[in-house]
């Protein structure tokens, strides 16, 4: 399954293409592709919201990428895949630090979710702009984001019809949140989080399984996500497969 580099790259790029919907209402957003690299920028001063994917060992590629970032005045974090990993030393020479490798995971829709039933005391609702403050509070708690970072993130919250952001509720309190970005017959999972005080209650699993089941029933065939070390156990438990480990570099 997805054993070749070309297959893995195709899925990573499909996930990236789906994420473009986050930026559709940001006037200064940038999407550029070069020979062996791709830049997607939300016009944020925070590099975590601007990303470059490098997938080639081409000579002079890093200098080209650095020049593009300087031209557009964009701070950007970088992911490497396949032959692109050979560019690590060159990027470190430009001040980037390797923060480790993040799992890129996939779930191919199957019948493993068909019998899932949400616990009786829980409900799920698709969120909208009216939920932005509650969502922001959860992101600040889970990801330790500052108000300034969350301010930039708000520009990408529920701005597209393809953005299916869901909240899991217990007694009218949101106890978990996740974004499912629909793209063709695929779904990218982003920004999943459960407030600290509600963790270790299985809420993340309940919400993720509900989303997997719901979007499978809507016709989705492939689901993608980048896992954190903390979240990977949950995704493993829900039947996701690790497709690759992508080095993640940042100056911040």
Residue ranges and their predicted role:
Residues 146-195:
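A conserved beta-strand-loop-helix scaffold within acyl/acetyltransferase catalytic domains
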Residues 2-5, 31-35, 109-129:
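Conserved N-terminal entry element of GNAT/NAT acetyltransferase domains
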Residues 85-98, 205, 229-245:
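Conserved active-site alpha-helix within GNAT-family acetyltransferase domains
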Residues 45-50, 99, 181-190, 199:
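A conserved beta-turn-beta hairpin within the catalytic core of GNAT-like acetyltransferases
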Residues 56-122, 225, 249-251:
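Acyl-donor-binding surface of acyltransferase catalytic domains
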Residues 59-66, 194, 200-213:
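Conserved acetyl-CoA-binding loop-helix of GNAT-fold acetyltransferases
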Residues 1-72:
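N-terminal charged segments
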Residues 129-141:
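A short, well-structured alpha-helix characteristic of acyl/acetyltransferase catalytic modules
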């Amino acid at each position: 399954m997805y054993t070749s580099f070309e297959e893995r790259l195709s899925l990573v790029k499909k996930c990236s293409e789906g994420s473009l919907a986050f930026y559709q209402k940001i006037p200064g957003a940038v999407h550029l592709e070069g020979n062996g690299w791709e830049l997607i920028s939300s016009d944020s001063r925070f590099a975590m919201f601007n990303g470059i994917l490098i997938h080639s060992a081409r000579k002079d590629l890093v200098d080209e990428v650095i020049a593009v970032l300087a031209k557009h005045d964009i701070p950007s974090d970088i992911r490497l895949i396949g032959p692109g990993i050979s560019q690590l030393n060159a990027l470190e020479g430009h001040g980037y630090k390797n923060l480790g490798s993040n799992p890129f995971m996939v779930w191919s829709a199957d019948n493993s979710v068909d019998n899932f039933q949400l616990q009786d005391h829980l409900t799920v609702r698709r969120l909208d702009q009216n939920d932005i403050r509650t969502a922001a509070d959860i992101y600040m708690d889970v990801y330790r984001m500052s108000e300034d970072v969350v301010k930039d993130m708000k520009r990408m919250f529920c701005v597209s019809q393809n953005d299916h952001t869901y909240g899991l509720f217990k007694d009218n309190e949101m106890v978990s949140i996740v974004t499912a970005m629909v793209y063709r017959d695929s779904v990218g999972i982003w920004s999943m989080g459960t407030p600290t005080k509600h963790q270790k209650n299985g809420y993340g699993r309940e919400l993720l399984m509900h989303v997997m089941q719901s979007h499978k029933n809507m016709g989705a065939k492939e689901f993608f996500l980048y896992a954190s070390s903390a979240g990977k156990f949950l995704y493993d438990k829900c039947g996701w497969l690790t497709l690759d480990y992508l080095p993640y570099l940042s100056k911040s």
